[in-house]
């Protein structure tokens, strides 16, 4: 990762980040549930300018028999960045990164999905990054968790995600693209606070042992807030469907 000083970019000044946030501040977060009527479950999640749409179909019988698992449902995840999601031109064909992140998101969700209740079926999760400004994988995990809940898939708990970065020696929560580009480290984390499980933990860059422990604690505090927002989005959706009755 290139240092911001070498690039002439100042990302931390007087304790505030380039967009005015304090180190532990999230970007403005917006969540909507049930926005695609042809899907069994759907959600739109926004962290600042990063926008991810999730759609869930299933449980359903697979078209190809090799997807069948005798004791549980197969969870299939497709992460895709829309060609217009970044400033650079992008091929519509799946890239190596998209294939890798599809696997990352699937593995972050599998610990909470009660797939054993639907043997010999598949649950498909489609994730479309509509706009990318950092933190797309953790936003995708969050959107997928919401869409699974909206589809009525039994889950042990909701999963939320956030990335912690190290910028000019300062640990910060919910990094955007500029911070990711010029930061010294980036640590995406996903967790299910209600059952005390971490389902995703990656690190790009170098942190000391103390920095790692601090960054993880910061991530988990932020994820607590993200999951509470998920619960509120689900509650609001059910109230709207039920005509506003508690």
From Swiss-Prot:
Pfam families: RNase_PH (PF01138), RNase_PH_C (PF03725). This is Exosome complex component Rrp41. NCBIfam families: ECX1 (TIGR02065). Catalytic component of the exosome, which is a complex involved in RNA degradation. Has 3'->5' exoribonuclease activity. Can also synthesize heteromeric RNA-tails. Keywords: Cytoplasm, Exonuclease, Exosome, Hydrolase, Nuclease. GO terms for cellular component: cytoplasmic exosome (RNase complex). It is found in: Cytoplasm. Its EC number is 3.1.13.-. CDD domains: RNase_PH_archRRP41. It comes from the Archaea. It is an enzyme of class 3 (hydrolase). Disulfide bonds: none annotated.
